[in-house]
């Protein structure tokens, strides 16, 4: 079962990368038209941006994501003994190399894993998580993150994060140019042009508006399924669902994190933004996760 899940995640990685490039190309066409009146130039430029983002994120995933989330590396057990030894123990049980360990200075309890594969993975925990959880609950949370590492979920998450970051960059570039740059002077020309030109202009705006939602849908589909799988994986490592159940209840009642990179929100074990009733929530409701764990 584990081998099949790993292979499935690898196949999904390929499909996600194809979808990533396609979506970036569409956004590039829209931005290229708004900026340069050239769909082809926009597509080529956007694909170059997308490839650069993907390569950077995949090859330097740990350092990039940790920098985005203000993580500080723990280089020895003396710096954070409980966290260090918990990560060490869970990695040993899961039979994966010990990930690098990071701490995020934030009173809200949370954690995430990142990297490209189990050999260069990393686990981050907030100071709030270390302070709030007892050893068993901490094992449940870290077991969840180690399961992401073992199942290659971190690679999929890294590519999804690159997708979101690249699209945000392109849309911000296009929006700023259109509103404040020479694009603002071109609007009258486009409006007075032919109907076909105006139609392409409108479609370009529609793409820029809805592309982030498409990216969110992709992240949501990936994140929801992998969270359930990682919960089950944590129980397989700790042999006690009550550890993770207790931890999830504490996470559910915690306040939002003070400083968090929004594009990284899907990586965390619990929604760090604590936004209620979001249409495109990347996390399944904690109540549903607890209900599934109680049936194990």
Curated annotation (Swiss-Prot):
InterPro entries with a match to the protein in the record: HtpX_protease, Pept_M48_protease_HtpX, Peptidase_M48
EC number: 3.4.24.-
Primary location group: membrane
GO cellular component terms listed in the entry, alphabetical order: plasma membrane
Coiled-coil intervals: none
Single annotated GO MF: zinc ion binding
Cofactor note (record): Binds 1 zinc ion per subunit.
Subcellular location: Cell membrane
Top EC class for this record: hydrolase
Transmembrane segments: 14-34, 38-58, 159-179, 198-218
Entry superkingdom: Bacteria
Keyword Transmembrane helix carried by entry: yes
Gene Ontology terms: biological process: proteolysis
Membrane topology: Multi-pass membrane protein
Protein name: Protease HtpX homolog
Natural source organism: Leuconostoc citreum (strain KM20)
């Amino acid at each position: 079962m584990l081998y099949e899940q790993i292979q499935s995640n690898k196949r999904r990685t390929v499909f996600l990368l194809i979808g990533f490039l396609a979506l970036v190309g569409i956004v590039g066409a829209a931005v290229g038209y708004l900026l340069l009146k050239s769909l082809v130039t926009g597509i080529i430029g956007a694909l170059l941006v997308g490839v650069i983002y993907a390569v950077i994120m995949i090859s330097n995933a740990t350092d990039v994501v940790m920098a985005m989330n203000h993580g500080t590396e723990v280089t020895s057990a003396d710096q954070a003994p409980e966290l260090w030894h918990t990560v060490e123990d869970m990695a040993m049980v899961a039979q994966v190399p010990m990930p690098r360990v990071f701490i995020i200075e934030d009173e809200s309890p949370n954690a995430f894993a990142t990297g490209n594969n189990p050999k260069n993975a990393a686990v981050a925990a907030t100071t709030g998580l270390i302070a709030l959880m007892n050893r068993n609950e901490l094992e449940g949370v870290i077991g969840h993150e180690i399961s992401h590492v073992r199942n290659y979920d971190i690679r999929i998450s890294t590519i999804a994060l690159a997708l979101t970051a690249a699209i945000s960059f392109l849309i911000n570039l296009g929006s700023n140019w259109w509103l404040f740059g020479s694009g603002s002077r071109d609007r009258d020309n486009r409006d007075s042009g032919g109907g076909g030109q105006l139609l392409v202009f409108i479609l370009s705006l529609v793409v820029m508006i809805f592309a982030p939602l498409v990216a969110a849908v992709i992240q949501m589909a990936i994140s929801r399924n992998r969270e359930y799988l990682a919960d089950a994986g944590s129980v397989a490592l700790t042999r006690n669902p009550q550890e993770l159940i207790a931890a999830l209840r504490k996470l559910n009642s915690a306040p939002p994190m003070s400083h968090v990179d929004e594009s990284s929100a899907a990586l965390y074990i619990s929604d760090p933004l604590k936004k209620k009733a979001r249409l495109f929530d990347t996390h399944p409701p904690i109540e549903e996760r607890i209900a599934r764990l109680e049936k194990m």
